């Protein structure tokens, strides 16, 4: 079958032919319709330090997708041929303390689709049926294809009560923008997002944020004053991994504020711990999506009127995959869809 794979330990990704995956007793086989390019896929393309330590070569990559069930393992219940599905990209063990305790997203033995095992940039994907999620009929293929990153956004945004709260999102990548849209949709008062990329900030404005702030051109304190905020932000969502952005977020938080961190900062990042301690801030790390509460919330948010369509900015056939990766690497894109049909 046709697949996109990391074939060489160098920059790039290549179209190739690989054997169709084998179906296990507890698996389903999915014929891929659409995939989306993740920031992780760009890291793998760039062959950065993380990729060199993590990705075995060769490896079929990709983990954002939607498709149709075409084969079912003999032990599988609850799925039928023809079901439209996406799926959780973290394959968990089922027997560690967190899995058995209902905290499956924190499984210490997690294996990543398209990272540690063959991924979705292929004509067919096999995953455990446990990981598959049926897509409701009133959700489009394109939106279903970005459920994985949308889930990161939902998990981060819904970490804390948002109704009537003021929220600061640092980092206007696609996940940060979707998180900001979720906050606004569920009842936050002011949702402010910061970045230095004007293309992405314009995209955030289209998604309905209160203010999209280029911190190279505007002072965040001035924006807060303009909005009538006198005590700081109640909730902070750190999506950038950039130390200056996190420091600015800490400085802008209200006393007793709550922070969810999805962005991965450098290991040697320094911050003013007085901001954390004397403000009594609560900081929560975010990994993946809660299985599967986040997935049900995703579907419900879209069905209740949350419009994510502006975040999808580019569409290519799979044979034009290089243009898709070029768009992602340019910084002037939202989500990029690759069509396999």
From Swiss-Prot:
Pfam family of the protein (one): ADH_zinc_N
Annotated NAD(+) binding sites: 175, 195, 200, 262-264, 286-287
GO biological process: L-threonine catabolic process to glycine
Residues that coordinate or bind Zn(2+) 1: 38, 63-64
GO function term, MF aspect, one: zinc ion binding
Active site, renumbered: 40 (charge relay system), 43 (charge relay system)
Pathway linked to the protein: Amino-acid degradation; L-threonine degradation via oxydo-reductase pathway; glycine from L-threonine: step 1/2
Subcellular location: Cytoplasm
Keyword Cytoplasm among record annotations: yes
Keywords: Cytoplasm, Metal-binding, NAD, Oxidoreductase, Zinc
Required cofactor names: Zn(2+)
Note describing how the cofactor binds: Binds 2 Zn(2+) ions per subunit.
Residues annotated as binding Zn(2+) 2: 93, 96, 99, 107
A Gene Ontology term for the protein's cellular component: cytoplasm
Regions crossing the membrane: none
Principal location class: cytoplasm
Enzyme class label: oxidoreductase
Sequence similarity: Belongs to the zinc-containing alcohol dehydrogenase family.
Summary of the function given for this chain in its UniProt record: Catalyzes the NAD(+)-dependent oxidation of L-threonine to 2-amino-3-ketobutyrate.
PANTHER family, A to Z: L-THREONINE 3-DEHYDROGENASE
Assembly with partners or alone: Homotetramer.
Protein's recorded name: L-threonine 3-dehydrogenase
Organism annotation: Yersinia enterocolitica serotype O:8 / biotype 1B (strain NCTC 13174 / 8081)
Lineage of source species: Bacteria, Pseudomonadati, Pseudomonadota, Gammaproteobacteria, Enterobacterales
Gene this protein is translated from: tdh
């Amino acid at each position: 079958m046709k697949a996109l794979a990391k074939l060489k330990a160098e920059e790039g990704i290549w179209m190739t032919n690989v054997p169709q995956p084998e179906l296990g007793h507890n698996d389903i086989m999915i014929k891929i319709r659409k995939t989306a390019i993740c920031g992780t896929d760009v890291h793998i393309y760039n062959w950065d330090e993380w990729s060199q330590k993590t990705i075995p070569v060769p490896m079929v990559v990709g983990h954002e997708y939607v498709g149709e069930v075409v084969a079912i393992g003999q032990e599988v219940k609850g799925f039928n041929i023809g079901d439209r599905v996406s799926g959780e990209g973290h394959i968990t063990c089922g027997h560690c303390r967190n899995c058995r305790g209902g905290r499956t997203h924190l499984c210490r033995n997690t294996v990543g689709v398209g990272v540690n095992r063959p991924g979705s940039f292929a004509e067919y994907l096999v995953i455990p049926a446990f990981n598959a999620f049926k897509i409701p009929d009133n959700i489009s293929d394109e939106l279903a294809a970005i459920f994985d990153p949308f889930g990161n956004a939902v998990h981060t945004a819904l970490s804390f009560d948002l109704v009537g709260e003021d929220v600061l999102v640092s980092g206007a990548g696609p996940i940060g923008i979707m998180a900001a849209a979720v906050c606004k949709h569920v009842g936050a008062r002011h949702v402010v997002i910061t970045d230095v990329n004007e293309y992405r900030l314009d995209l955030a404005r289209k998604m309905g944020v209160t203010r999209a702030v280029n911190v190279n051109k505007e002072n965040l304190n001035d924006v807060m004053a303009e909005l009538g905020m006198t005590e700081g932000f109640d909730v902070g969502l750190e999506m950038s991994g950039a130390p200056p952005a996190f420091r600015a977020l800490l400085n802008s938080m209200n006393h007793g504020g709550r922070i969810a961190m999805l962005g991965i900062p450098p290991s040697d990042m320094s911050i003013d711990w007085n901001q954390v301690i004397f403000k009594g801030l609560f900081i929560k790390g975010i990994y993946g999506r809660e299985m599967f509460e986040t997935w049900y919330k995703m579907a419900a948010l879209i069905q209740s009127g949350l419009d994510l369509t502006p975040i999808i900015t580019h569409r290519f056939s799979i044979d034009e995959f290089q243009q898709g990766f070029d768009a992602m690497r340019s910084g002037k894109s939202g989500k990029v869809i690759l069509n396999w049909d």
